[in-house]
Amino acid sequence: MQQIYTVKEIRSVAARSGPFAPVLSATSRGVAGALRPLVQATVPATPEQPVLDLKRPFLSRESLSGQAVRRPLVASVGLNVPASVCYSHTDIKVPDFSEYRRLEVLDSTKSSRESTEARKGFSYLVTGVTTVGVAYAAKNAVTQFVSSMSASADVLALAKIEIKLSDIPEGKNMAFKWRGKPLFVRHRTQKEIKQEAAVELSQLRDPQHDLDRVKKPEWVILIGVCTHLGCVPIANAGDFGGYYCPCHGSHYDASGRIRLGPATLNLEVPTYEFTSDDMVIVG
């Protein structure tokens, strides 16, 4: 039958052993008995390989160093600059723009001053042609835009009026509507013609001879709007037998010239044309 000696018992024996006490006290050992083992037996584990996720890159010092540039080193040394080392890339393809360059400057060993005038002339020619084309296109665009704002054909048709002169008796004045304004057409007598032709220009506020206001002496065509504040004068009235403005008392003669009152200008003469002895077109 085996016995198990404890540590305390071994130490007590070593203490009583005399000169061998230091040796015996420095060593202690447990002796296993048959009843219970001191240390449980361990079963060796089977080693397993670690499984890596191949979808994700494995970053380590070795993998990162493998991606570094591995090219010949180029060192540059100068007197006034510190030494430097850089990596030289020999796999870079420099683009060639020879197809887009002019023939005169393809040769790098040839001076470009010899072809300066020719190249400048070509550039000026292209610029001039482009400028003319842009100006022509802009002119057409502006013309079309301005013409779109002009009056239409039906409006232009109303801008002119035909008047039959045989409907106006001698010594009478007829009023028409033209462009939204009253239009006076007066058939003057010989007495009125001589009277207005004899008026001296020094007596007029707005000097103008009678022959300068008519194309035919017997016909006077005027716009019936007072030049003072825009009232409509009355025909065959006033101190001079022509037109009278009842608003502020302006007097005009038979030629439409201002003679008295606050108005300062003569009645306006529109543009007209005699197409025949019996027809006139105003506008």
Swiss-Prot record:
SUPFAM superfamilies linked: ISP domain, ISP transmembrane anchor, Non-globular alpha+beta subunits of globular proteins
Q: Which gene encodes it?
A: UQCRFS1P1
What Gene Ontology cellular component terms go with this record? mitochondrion; respiratory chain complex III
Q: Which PROSITE patterns does its entry note?
A: RIESKE (PS51296)
Q: List the disulfide bonds.
A: 231-247
Query: Sorted alphabetically, which InterPro entries does this protein's record hold?
Result: bc1_Rieske_TM_sf, Globular_prot_asu/bsu, Rieske_2Fe-2S, Rieske_2Fe-2S_sf, Rieske_Fe-S_prot, Rieske_Fe-S_prot_C, Rieske_TM, Ubiquinol_cyt_c_Rdtase_Fe-S-su
Q: Name one GO molecular function term.
A: ubiquinol-cytochrome-c reductase activity
List the CDD domains hit by this protein, alphabetically.
Rieske_cytochrome_bc1
* Transmembrane stretches, start-end: 116-149
Q: By what name is this protein known?
A: Putative cytochrome b-c1 complex subunit Rieske-like protein 1
Q: Which BP terms in the Gene Ontology apply to this protein?
A: mitochondrial electron transport, ubiquinol to cytochrome c
- How, per the record, is the cofactor bound? Binds 1 [2Fe-2S] cluster per subunit.
Q: Nucleus: is it a keyword of this entry? A: no
Q: Where does [2Fe-2S] cluster bind?
A: 226, 228, 245, 248
Q: How does it sit in the membrane?
A: Single-pass membrane protein
The family annotation for this protein states: Belongs to the Rieske iron-sulfur protein family.
Q: Which metal ions or organic cofactors does this protein require, according to UniProt? A: [2Fe-2S] cluster
Species the sequence originates in: Homo sapiens
List the keywords (alphabetical). 2Fe-2S, Disulfide bond, Iron, Iron-sulfur, Membrane, Metal-binding, Transmembrane, Transmembrane helix
Q: Where in the cell is the protein located? A: Membrane
